[in-house]
């Protein structure tokens, strides 16, 4: 039986060349809007395997040189698939972690005795307890330290990192507010390990992700932006459409302290690793005509013209040749001969998607209808809802299908 089919159900298939270019030149062309090196994969599993490959190579290179491999590790859920892959390789005896030193990227503060919220426990449960990292090589920020000793504790953490020769790699996730580790919006690029107040957005995420009724503490102790940027290499992972908006800002927008992850743009060896869902709003995926030549399917042409209408605030039938040329769509003029021809074609296509018979109208000419007339009635399967279903009136569509006697 084939499992995990949900990740393979795709309504908008992205051409492979947009996310997996064959050459460095092709990558340079399609990624020119991106300010951090970004690798896009068809699935989370492929992306996690890619990151694990890089970590494995680093660990083995350090082993050959008789050195420690020093890692800063986040505990967010986006890293679980990477940790699972590393554990799998350890279990298959292809990788040892005996030379690895781990520094936890952040910890909640203050913690109550026997708290279930400790991020280091999450790291151990998911990863460290399943591999051969020496216990004495695992370090974490102290969520129990007295308030008057917090600053000294943070300075000691920085010193311990330096004692091991600095960070070789930082593995990070990203929050909805663009936070990395627990660096909230407003964190400066020079910030070191410190105490920080947890923001409302981060608190909501934490409360949703923690499998406990225990109250999230008000603060965190976190590696600072400067601490993370001191790593020789950095990998930032994100999966799924819910991360698409923030990843577009992190990768393509300007650096700002309101988006801490954007500081990774200053690092020469920072890598963003995401799946197609999280890459959805990147220019090369959502608006590929702005960065490369396209194979123009009807669907892509419709997407381009709807985008152009929204950008210019014009109805489709009023778009001109100049509008096309000045907005990266000159290829469509060559394809259709003129803006007028393209406008009429796509206007008619869009018009024919509107119907009061979503299952097809029986005993009617279906030449220009979006759904065929036969067979009737049809058997209709509705998969799990999407956040945008209310916008496209999916509830009304389902109701109409039932009213028109389809087997829903």
Give the role of each language-model region.
Residues 181-225:
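Class I SAM-dependent methyltransferase SAM-binding "motif I" and its flanking Rossmann-like core
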Residues 326-408:
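Active-site rim/loop-helix segments in enzyme catalytic domains that contact anionic ligands
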């Amino acid at each position: 039986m084939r499992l995990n089919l949900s990740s393979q159900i795709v309504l908008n298939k992205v051409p492979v060349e947009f996310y997996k270019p064959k050459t460095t030149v092709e990558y340079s062309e399609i990624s020119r809007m991106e300010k951090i090196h970004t690798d896009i994969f068809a699935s989370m599993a492929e992306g996690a395997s890619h990151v694990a490959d890089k970590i494995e190579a680093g660990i083995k290179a350090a082993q050959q040189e008789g050195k420690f491999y020093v890692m800063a590790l986040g505990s967010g859920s986006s890293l679980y698939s990477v940790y699972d892959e590393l554990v799998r390789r350890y279990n298959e005896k292809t990788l040892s972690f005996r030379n690895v030193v781990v520094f936890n990227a952040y910890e909640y503060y203050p913690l109550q005795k026997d708290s279930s919220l400790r991020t280091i426990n999450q790291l151990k449960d998911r990863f460290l307890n399943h591999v051969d990292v020496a216990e004495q090589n695992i370090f974490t920020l102290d969520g129990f330290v007295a308030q008057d000793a917090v600053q000294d504790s943070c300075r000691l953490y920085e010193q311990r990192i330096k004692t091991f020769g600095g960070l070789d790699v930082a593995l990070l996730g990203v929050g909805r507010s663009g936070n990395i580790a627990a660096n909230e919006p407003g964190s400066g690029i020079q910030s070191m390990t410190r105490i920080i107040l947890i923001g409302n957005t981060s608190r909501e995420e934490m409360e949703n992700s923690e499998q406990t009724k225990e109250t999230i503490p008000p603060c965190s102790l976190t590696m600072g932006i400067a601490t993370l940027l001191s790593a020789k290499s950095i990998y930032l992972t994100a999966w799924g459409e819910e991360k698409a908006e923030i990843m577009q800002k992190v990768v393509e927008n300007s650096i700002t302290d309101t988006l801490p992850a954007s500081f990774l743009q200053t690092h020469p060896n920072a890598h963003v690793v995401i799946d197609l869902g999280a890459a959805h709003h990147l220019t090369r995926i959502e608006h590929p005509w702005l960065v490369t030549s396209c194979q123009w399917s009807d669907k892509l042409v419709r997407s381009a013209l709807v985008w152009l209408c929204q950008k210019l605030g014009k109805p489709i039938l009023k778009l001109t040749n100049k509008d096309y040329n000045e907005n990266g769509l000159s290829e469509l003029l060559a394809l259709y001969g003129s803006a007028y021809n393209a406008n009429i074609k796509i206007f008619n296509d869009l018009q024919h998607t509107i119907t009061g018979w979503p299952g097809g109208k029986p005993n009617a000419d279906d030449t220009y209808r979006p759904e065929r007339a036969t067979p009737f009635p049809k058997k209709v399967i509705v998969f799990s809802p999407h956040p945008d279903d209310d916008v496209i009136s999916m509830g009304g569509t389902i109701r109409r299908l039932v009213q028109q006697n389809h087997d829903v």
